[in-house]
Amino acid sequence: MVQVRGAAQGPPEPGAAGPGVIGDGDGAQAAAGGPGDGAQAAPGGPGDAAQSSSGGAAAPAEAPRGEARYYEQSFRLVLWRHGQTRWNVEGRFQGQSDIPLDEVGERQAERAARLLAGLRPAAIVSSDLGRAMATAAPLARLTGLTVTTDKDLRERYGGLWEGLTDSEIRTRYPDEHAVWLPPAGESSAAVADRAGAALERIAAGMAPGTLVVVVSHGAAIRLAAARLLGFPEDLWGAVGPLANCAWSILGRRRSRWRLLEHNAGTLPEPVLSDDR
């Protein structure tokens, strides 16, 4: 179990987040980085007491509201997909084959790390596959954190599909392709259970207000997120795929998970994935 303790982390810094926050009806609808209920913090931050104009006693500090309160009272997981590989470009099913980042993927990781470092992560946990570890490395250098690995964050095992293109899979395994179940590989439910359990283990060691970056893979992230959000299996496809080096953010408060961001990133990237 990853033990994560420390001071509460604030909301993302401007420019360090992607699309707007997806709220759940509690007033947290806002563009990334802004207070969820439209209230603007006083100069000096919500934790500073306001001084009266007469120079008298300070007024009580206003309690954080909306999105700021959510960040203070919850913890967050940044689910970061690895950078681009040659097999991504060629459209080959990677699965658990240990394919390294290409030069583009390395640049993507460096660029994304500069933004993610601004979120002040308390820990970095990665799949043990090389492309995930190489993606985590620039963030580890910037933050001074040590990367912890968890093999349960690996991509879906593709069995006989690994190394094949989608057209080759469709031709050789039409029945299995129709239901997206690789022969000798993992089902979507198995991936959701495995990767979802890994995220729950990480969350169990987190203190309120902390943020952990989890480096994983497209299908593993998508399916684990759908599992934690409580989606029925027939709606898992509603969570779309991730571009290389993009991330999603899950938050949890009072045992309830919610999706804060999905497929956020540094620049628009095409989705090159064997997930669907």
Language model feature labels by segment:
Residues 260-276:
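Acidic, His/Gly-rich catalytic cores of divalent-metal-dependent hydrolytic chemistry
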Residues 78, 84-139, 184-196:
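Loop-to-helix element that buttresses phosphate recognition and phosphoryl-transfer chemistry
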Residues 3-9, 14-19, 56-72, 111-172, ...:
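Phosphate-coordination/substrate-recognition cap region in phosphate-metabolizing enzymes
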Residues 26-52:
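Long, intrinsically disordered low-complexity tandem-repeat segments
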Residues 232-258:
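Domain-level recognition of soluble alpha/beta enzyme cores
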Residues 77, 210-216:
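Generic beta-sheet signal
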Residues 171-190:
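Short glycine/proline- and acidic residue-enriched helix-loop micro-motifs
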Residues 82, 217:
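Short, conserved phosphate/pyrophosphate- and ester-handling motifs at nucleotide-, phospho-/glycolipid
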